[in-house]
Every structure is written in structure tokens, then in C-alpha cells.
Amino acid sequence: MCIGIPMRVVVGSEFIAQCERHGAISSISLMLVGPQAPGTHLLTHLGSAIRVLDADEARAIDDALAGLAEAVEGRAFDMLFADLISREPELPPHLRGE
């Protein structure tokens, strides 16, 4: 399983951006997504941006990763999965058999 990490562009160039997550700065390749402006949210994996995110998507992914960390530590994590609590999961259209 691969895990994508949301990061925010601080300084971008044509092929590389300096991106921030929780105060840590990393150099991220932009070869798959093209040049991005400062403030843009990116989904990253192994030093490469793989998708541009909006702020809500970045926050939801960051919350999910924090929830996993809380679960591993044996702490409460429901508040970090607000989009999933109190609703039935839905199958994607291609699995519904409609």
C-alpha cells in the first residue's frame, strides 16, 4: 500500500518545489503535475507530487493520517474522520451492480 502525503508549496520552480508539512520543508518533484504556485496543495509520494489537491482534500487526508497515528497509539480518533462517522459506507458505482 502506498500512502500519499499532503504538502503545501512554499516556493516553486518549473520542475521542483519546496513544500511544507507541519513545519518541515522538503524538495518535491513537479514532473507529474507541472509548475505550481506557492500555496498550492499537493499529494506527494516518495519525493514527487502526484496530484494537485484543493484545501479541503488536503485537510481530509491530513486528518486521516493523524487518525491512523492516534489509532496506533490507542487514542481516540473519531473526530479526525468526521466525513465517515454517522453514515453508512457507499460502494463506488462500478461495484454496485446496477
UniProtKB/Swiss-Prot annotation:
Extent of the signal sequence: none
Gene field: hupF
Record field: transmembrane: none
Matching NCBIfam families: hypC_hupF
Family: Belongs to the HupF/HypC family.
Origin superkingdom: Bacteria
PROSITE patterns documented for this protein: HUPF_HYPC (PS01097)
Name the record gives this protein: Hydrogenase expression/formation protein HupF
SUPFAM superfamilies: HupF/HypC-like
Pfam families per the UniProt record, alphabetical: HupF_HypC
One GO term (biological process): protein maturation
GO molecular function: carbon dioxide binding; iron ion binding
